[in-house]
Amino acid sequence: MMILTDKDRRTLTLRWRHFSVFSVLEWHRLLALRTTIFVVEQQCPYQEVDEKDPLCWHLELLHNQQLIGTLRVVPPGVAYAECSVGRVAIDSNYRGLGLGRELMDAALGFCEPRWPQGVRLSAQAYLQAFYESLGFQTVQGPYLEDDIPHIEMLKRFG
């Protein structure tokens, strides 16, 4: 696990981009990180890339310009009536540092002014307490998604 000093934290950058502005190399790096986590680490032999990505806003977390985390925001009407957050991924060397919370805080700040009806997500069940700490409530589940236990959660704004 990496230890981030205050100086290191100042070199962290959050960057929002729509799929349409990624270069091929940048998109490849993002997919490589997601695939490492969701396919290799979790031993989940299912399709990582889907038809939603081209419609999404993607948040990148960079440390010294190296991609170490990402998530995507899916607009309302694509997966759910509300917008949704998914594919939250942190490089294994940077876990346990609160960076997942930083990504989620940024995502909620991005979503609330654009889609004030709230945010829905399909969370891996073991992360329920984490998402509850961000104000999400379980609305369905547990159920299997790609053979991994998940729960559907919702956060209303206001």
Language-model-detected regions and their locations in the chain:
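Short amphipathic alpha-helix that is part of the acyltransferase structural core
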Residues: 2-67
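N-terminal, polar/charged subdomain of small-to-medium soluble alpha/beta proteins
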Residues: 4-10, 70, 87, 91, ...
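Conserved beta-strand in the GNAT
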Residues: 60, 66-76, 81-89
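A short beta-turn/loop motif at secondary-structure boundaries
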Residues: 49-54, 77, 144-145
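Conserved catalytic-core motifs of GNAT/GCN5-like acyltransferases
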Residues: 122, 132, 137-152
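Conserved acetyl-CoA-binding loop-helix of GNAT-fold acetyltransferases
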Residues: 90, 96-109
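A conserved beta-turn-beta hairpin within the catalytic core of GNAT-like acetyltransferases
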Residues: 75-85, 95, 115-117, 146-150
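Conserved GNAT acetyl-CoA-binding A-motif
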Residues: 104, 111-124
